[in-house]
Each structure stands twice: as C-alpha cells, then as structure tokens.
C-alpha cells in the first residue's frame, strides 16, 4: 500500500486512528476501513466476534465521520448485490445473509460499502480520500 501512495506522490504516515484504517488529514470526516475479503467482512458483521467492528461503526456515527468499507474481494463482486451469490468455505453465513447485514448497516449508520480488486486498493483509497465529504 505504501508503494501506491509513494507512486502517487502522497505524503503518508502510520498512526492509530479512532475509526478506520485510512484518512486524509485535510478531510478527517471521511475514513476508509479496508477489509481483505468477504470472509473478513462476514466475520466482522455476522460472527460472535463482531463487537469491536460494531463499536467502530457506532463511534464513526457519533463522531460525524463518513465511514467507507473497502472490501478487496475482487472477482465477480463489484456491488452489494453481487454479495448475494458469494459462498464462504469458512462461515455458516451465506451471501444473502451478508448482503442483508451490509444493507442494514448502510441504512442505519450511513456506512458505504465498496468493492475492488486487491491490485487496485491503493488507487481506490487515494481516489476515495480525495473526494469531498
């Protein structure tokens, strides 16, 4: 990821954030949280170990932060609707279950869910954080 930022000439530093993984200091009201695939997203939204993620979602809303979840699943998953066809080898939850949870979080908390190929993650983060809130 650092290489993508370096190539784009973007100054960056590592620091713990209250919410998410990436923020543009010039626009702290917009944050990107990266998920490596739908299995990780499903674990965060559906499993018994989801408390930390839900606290982060609530914290973002309380802070007035627009949270974007960027899932690096790739393949045929380009939109939330595509999630319905997903099948996990690890989770008892299916794609339709996950899609419904995603929609609930989007409607209740204003969280935006986007999907990209892993090779495009850095480029997507740069594009998203350059956008106005």
Residue ranges of each PLM-predicted region?
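Non-catalytic C-terminal interaction segments of nucleic acid-processing enzymes
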Residues: 1-27, 40-133
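Conserved catalytic cores of phosphodiester-cleaving nucleases, focusing on short active-site segments
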Residues: 30-36
